[in-house]
Amino acid sequence: MNPFILFFSGLLLGASLYFFHRRESRQFAALLKDKNARLEQEKRIVVEFMHNLAVAIGEGVPRKELYQRIAHTAVITTGAMSACIYEKNKSGRLQGVAVEGLFPPQRAIKQSKLKEGESRARFLETILTSETLEEGEGIVGQVAKTGKPVLVEDATVDPRVVLHKDDSLKSRSLVYAPLIHDDRSYGVLVVANPSNGLSFSQMDF
């Protein structure tokens, strides 16, 4: 073969490999930068979350309002569509005390009509705040009893999750987290259904 052709072929191959390597390096750098940016964002969210809680506690915010702030912040930080906090009372039972969004009740509900002028969110809040679970009952009770979080990636195939007929109350994916301070269990925080339509994963957990 003509030596000039071999030379230029080698030059072209070398240049191609060089630019391919540069492109891969740029893509890797971009991915790394994006990952670092996401980590920084998550760090800011956590810091802001803790700051807001510290401010609320310092201001002497009533417990129910504090729980409501936690539920609201949990929805924002996890990208969930709804959240609910179940507080553990003196008898060990779990009472719904704070709701954010259209949270699916953890028990089957009887279909009843909305009162005149009552919003759907208010209707569900009334149901959830009147919902009392026994310690050990369902996933909420299990988390309260063991102090260990539970991830339900696909709620549609998990027999522990109540499946509601109402589409707006269907559970797709949930994360249950115990509320513990100084080794004392105060209740359980549950976030439901990522707003992006996907499922929660171990990364969120």
Predicted regions and their residues:
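Signal-transmission linkers at sensory-effector interfaces
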Residues: 6-59, 64
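Amphipathic alpha-helical coiled-coil segments that mediate homodimerization
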Residues: 49-57, 62-81, 85-86, 139
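GAF sensory/regulatory domain recognition
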Residues: 84-131, 157
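Signal-transducing coupling segments at domain and membrane junctions
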Residues: 95, 126, 136-141, 145-173
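Regulatory loop-to-helix N-cap segments in sensory/regulatory domains
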Residues: 162, 186, 192-205
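A short, aliphatic-rich beta-strand micro-motif
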Residues: 172-180
